[in-house]
């Protein structure tokens, strides 16, 4: 309905009408000087924002590829460097196990790429003894950041968007397309990036090629990386370190003489006994080496690491003439290797270890006796698997991990910029993804110092030893997804409706193989010398009557440790779990005029799993997730926000397989973990920038942990059945999050344009921890996953035309709260004992970083950064947490904590080229 505009004739109107002819005449007189100006069109690519999916944006962070470049993100640890409340979970062997958010980590924080879940952190039981706390890798595959267009980090329950795993938050990556490389108005694009990071001697080389011919287009990205371990502050590794090593010395006993028959040229005992040899015994000798070469629990430096990565991404496609329809494909292959040596394992035997093993083994024939002048050949003791190991060789423990990801898929995208049909946007995609983690443990005892990973026992190296153990874990997904978006108005209310559907066939497979040992022995016998003139000789080891022995070449013995069906770590029966899942989600973000925005979402998930192993806790799970949010806008400069959301995590494949204690376990019913998030915030915004402060409350229940069902018998609590993964814990946390960016020119226009400041703060407090009464032998939930409270303050300048810029960042972290590391364990007898996650916690620390960039002719950008500018000595909690009980591969028997020191002053450089 059109409104009628009434025209009222008055003195003012008459005056204007009278003046108009004269004005028109003047314009006509000057028309000869008029020029038609060209039409200027300004186009900008749509950037992902915090409020794209959820109206409040509370708890969300969005980073574009440009942001990643500016922050010099070269690996997973750089991604959240300046984002308090989000931390990387160290896997313990150079890799990572995802992120920790709001007290939860690993599989409780969802990780997806284009909606496809990445591999779970699968921790298998470890072999008894040794240094390992997990038999498998426990890592989560890392993402190639040069392939990333944008990343959205959500803190708080987020299953309505990301499904299972988003119990405490989610990290969602979006892959680049050809448009991200091809410049506006061009038909092709080339991007190259060369970067070096001093903290780990990391080198990155990436090149992206994209082109468009007619409707056809394609993108190709290749990235290679090579790096070492993250080096600690130089002060942590200064000096030298000493250790004891067992060396051979002559036995002082009067009855320790012998003759080797093979060394007696004429074979006559009587002739050769005039020059007998003396037995050897072990004695500790103090030796000194550099801190880099030292092995043992008191090692100052981190374990050496060799890291390599190769990634290919290929995205071909065809865009139809009207540009509404697009059909494309994606092929991705990424392989990363993490090869490390555990140098906390002493390379050399000591007298204490030698004597203890020898005592345990009893009498060892030939001990102390050697051939030739090779005195070390007489020092050997009992080792693993009944093998004898010599003091001559050093021990090396190596972990070689290879992470391989392969993905290919098809997609159809419909985009309607005119918004005049049933959908503004629709996407139908099919992805087939396989991710495998190959974890190979090797223990060598066949080289001089233990550093040779490739040495093997041989007949000419008696008492040498080798052990291999390999666990290969893989997951596969065949995922079909559909997404629809539509904006429309009803009664002056703007709706932004989206519908998401998905169906997945998945599989999990763990193979335990190459589990064997090899050892080299020697031929030895103690003989009776031939009679002398018919007289029997009985040697007693004295100088005049030495022993008469034979020492010959031995052989190599190989023994298999793998067993089938014994339900312990040595069981090498393949583990397989398969299943299907589907989901349906709907979300509507509504704009109620200029005063308020309201949003709500609902999602239904279904998962069914099965296995050939009857002990696996498979089954069917149905879950419903939702969220709701509101933004009140009383003024142009103030927003009041509030949101609630739920999250869930279905039992992981490792939890479904269960804990095997040598008996045939029974399958148990495991319910999904659940979470409920409440969050309220206030946002100040304007020409000055924006500042947001929020308070959150996260409650977790039915947390899954290993333990027993409890029962009361004769008035006492006792365990029922076998150990299993059970729903047993609940917890609640609260916290504060502050985020802001200030444009100083907007605050005061006298200041130059381009100056800005940033501020971020996060604090979490544990409010409640409970254990179910019908569970026992349960460890209370320890919040070692909480990052200590942290402030990040920045001051920067970007030249208005984007030619150059500089930025300084101050990061201050508080100490790790001791209360977050203390807990109790419910014992089988009904009592409990106090526990502690780890023996150490970190102190407060601060660092200053400075970075900048300079662009030459719009094609070349040089970036540089100085991190820990003041060369401050500090230790992060994320590093020390590797010694905590909740660590994936817990570091045990740590003597000194220098090895966890953060890098000192270090530099990063990169050169970007765009054409």
Curated annotation (Swiss-Prot):
The keyword Membrane is annotated on this UniProt entry: yes
Region (L3 helix finger, interacts with transferrin): 351-361
UniProt superkingdom: Bacteria
Main location: membrane
Effect of residue 722 to A: Binds about 50% TF
GO biological process, alphabetically ordered: siderophore transmembrane transport
Residue ranges, annotated region (Plug loop, interacts with transferrin): 121-139
Signal peptide residues on this chain, from the entry's feature table: 1-24
Keyword Transferase attached: no
Motif extent (TonB C-terminal box): 898-915
Disulphide bond pairs: none
Domain TBDR plug: 51-176
Note: Present in outer membrane vesicle formulations which are used as vaccines in human. N.meningitidis cells will only bind to human TF, not bovine or porcine TF, explaining at least in part the bacteria's inability to cause infection in non-human hosts.
Comment on protein domains: The N-terminal periplasmic domain encodes a plug that inserts into the 22 beta-strand barrel, the extracellular loops extend up to 60 Angstroms away from the outer membrane. Part of the plug (the plug loop, resides 121-139) interacts with transferrin (TF), as does the L3 helix finger in extracellular loop 3 (residues 351-361). When the L3 helix finger inserts into TF it disturbs the conformation of TF and its coordination of iron 2.
Name the record gives this protein: Transferrin-binding protein A
Organism annotation: Neisseria meningitidis serogroup B (strain ATCC BAA-335 / MC58)
